[in-house]
Amino acid sequence: FIIKVPLVKKKSLRKNLKEHGLLKDFLKKHSPNPASKYFPQEAAVMATQPLENYMDMEYF
């Protein structure tokens, strides 16, 4: 059987942060570290695999 999940379109995180003038600060504080993906033992912090393009998501 098929279950339909209703989706709602809203502004993306990137658009909201940009409208409030907070995008640059957010990107500085949450910059991705590609080295942690391929060399987790060499990364300074715990290795994580971030979602790519999560800031552009518009459907929830």
From Swiss-Prot:
This is Pepsin A. Keywords: Aspartyl protease, Digestion, Hydrolase, Protease, Secreted, Zymogen. Disulfide bonds: none annotated. Residues 1-45 form a propeptide. It is found in: Secreted. Its EC number is 3.4.23.1. It is an enzyme of class 3 (hydrolase).
